[in-house]
Amino acid sequence: MNEDTTTLVEETNTTTQAALRQLSQTTPLVNAITNDVTVNQVANIILHWGGLPVMSDDVRELDEMVNAAEACLLNMGTVSETGEEAMMTAGQAASEHDAGLVLDPVGAGATATRSRVAERLSTTLDVDVINGNRGEVAALVGEDAEVRGVESVGEHPDAAETAIACAQHTEAVVVSSGVTDIVATAETAFELNVGDEMLGTLVGTGCMLGGTIAAFCGGLDDPLTAALTGTVAFGLAGEAAANGEFGEYAGPASYETTVLDAAAGTDPEMIAAVDIDNRVNRVLAEAK
């Protein structure tokens, strides 16, 4: 692990604080092609982290829109032929205009079509960060993945090794979400113990994490730093919401609103008060 990566892990708290300050100073424009189910949540989470969301998926304007953006999110939740081509167009524009590119391969492994589209997007485009659940990440490297609909089921004991293999295959930083989150490069992986089980009661938290990472990619130069600090910030917002720090909630529906409030209210001072550094650990793993 090189010196820069060691510093990033050992100083996660201060790095996350710095990332939030950078977002507030830059207000990155993020073009998100996301699914019909979660478009509102994704737009709001981008806004609450300090970004400016725009949800264009029209191929007639995507090059122009992405040219103006600092980051682009491609979410496969409601994949279609026209949607696939829109994502290809947006992804190519992101590379041409040096915008951060985040791919959420929703449902990869569930059907042959989704697996094919995910493989095309992840290997043809110059993706900076891939954000998926355990099953989706496994599917991208050809492993048997238990994905039912768009949800990952079953056990994934080799999640870190699989994430590293995915990073090598796609040349992207990989975020593999689960009970704990894995952030991987082609050389190593890190386990993040952040978040709350209440996040699992909502449809769309993975999409919201993707929107978070896209916002951080828009405000930061380094994809690994953006993936790590974005995942930490989203997890801590989920914890703060579950702990009642942003108001009481009666169940999943009101908890979702509280998560958005927590994202809007998460600032460097709040991060400074949380012991994060011992909850981010390097996983000693080699690709399979």
UniProtKB/Swiss-Prot annotation:
It comes from the Archaea. GO terms for molecular function: ATP binding; hydroxyethylthiazole kinase activity; magnesium ion binding. ATP binds at residues 131, 177. Pathway: Cofactor biosynthesis; thiamine diphosphate biosynthesis; 4-methyl-5-(2-phosphoethyl)-thiazole from 5-(2-hydroxyethyl)-4-methylthiazole: step 1/1. GO terms for biological process: thiamine biosynthetic process; thiamine diphosphate biosynthetic process. InterPro entries: Hyethyz_kinase, Ribokinase-like. Substrate binds at residues 55, 204. The keyword tRNA processing does not apply. It is an enzyme of class 2 (transferase). Its cofactor is Mg(2+). Keywords: ATP-binding, Kinase, Magnesium, Metal-binding, Nucleotide-binding, Thiamine biosynthesis, Transferase. It catalyses: 5-(2-hydroxyethyl)-4-methylthiazole + ATP = 4-methyl-5-(2-phosphooxyethyl)-thiazole + ADP + H(+). Coiled coil: none annotated. Belongs to the Thz kinase family. Catalyzes the phosphorylation of the hydroxyl group of 4-methyl-5-beta-hydroxyethylthiazole (THZ). HAMAP family: Thz_kinase (MF_00228). This is Hydroxyethylthiazole kinase. It comes from Haloquadratum walsbyi (strain DSM 16790 / HBSQ001).
